[in-house]
């Protein structure tokens, strides 16, 4: 058993009743290792609703900020998009919307953020997070089209129009 396997085993052996702090302690050791199995394991944790919210948010931030291969970036972006539409907590959805700002070049991310920003029944915090992640994409054709749709929104329209003006598109 190598170090990655050992740490994954330790994490799993702690079980569902282990505190978030105990799980985070193991994750900190695991994250130091450069091994593709680490990303795979973190993705499993991110998608596991039985994990404590603190663990899932920590994993999300690690995946957002950590070194990823091109293939891993696509996989992580897909997992983050799933969190936007699932029954996850508002905080996790908010963190996913913000994290997707790092993945705007990946197919499917901009439409997912646009749909969320345009959804009037969602929380304004979540919609604004999606908008700021869209803004990070810069003035691409797809992003500009989404922002034009959003520019008439009662809550976000003013901020959107300001971005379009700053980009010299309105």
Predicted regions and their residues:
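Amphipathic alpha-helical scaffolding segments comprising HEAT/armadillo-like alpha-solenoid repeats
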Residues: 1-14, 35-47, 69-85, 104-118, ...
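Alpha-helical segment of the N-proximal tetratricopeptide repeat
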Residues: 13, 25-33
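Conserved hydrophobic register position within alpha-solenoid helical repeats
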Residues: 23-26, 56-59, 96, 127-130, ...
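Eukaryote-skewed repeat-based solenoidal scaffolds used as protein-protein interaction platforms
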Residues: 80, 84, 91-98
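Extended alpha-helical scaffolding segments
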Residues: 122-159, 169-170
């Amino acid at each position: 058993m190598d170090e990655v396997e050992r740490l994954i085993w330790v994490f799993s052996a702690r079980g569902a009743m282990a505190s978030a702090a105990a799980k985070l302690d193991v994750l900190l050791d695991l994250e130091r290792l450069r091994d593709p199995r680490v990303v795979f394991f973190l993705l499993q944790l991110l998608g596991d609703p039985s994990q404590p919210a603190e663990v899932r948010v920590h994993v999300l931030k690690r995946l957002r900020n950590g070194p990823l291969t091109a293939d891993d970036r696509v996989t992580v972006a897909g997992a983050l998009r799933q969190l936007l539409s699932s029954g996850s907590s508002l905080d996790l959805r908010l963190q996913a919307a913000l994290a997707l700002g790092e993945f705007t070049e990946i197919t499917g991310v901009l439409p997912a953020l646009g749909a969320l920003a345009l959804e009037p029944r969602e929380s304004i915090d979540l919609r604004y997070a999606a908008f700021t992640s869209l803004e990070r994409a810069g003035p691409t054709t797809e992003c500009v089209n989404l922002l034009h749709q959003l520019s008439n929104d009662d809550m976000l329209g003013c901020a959107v129009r300001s971005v379009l003006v700053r980009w010299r598109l309105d």
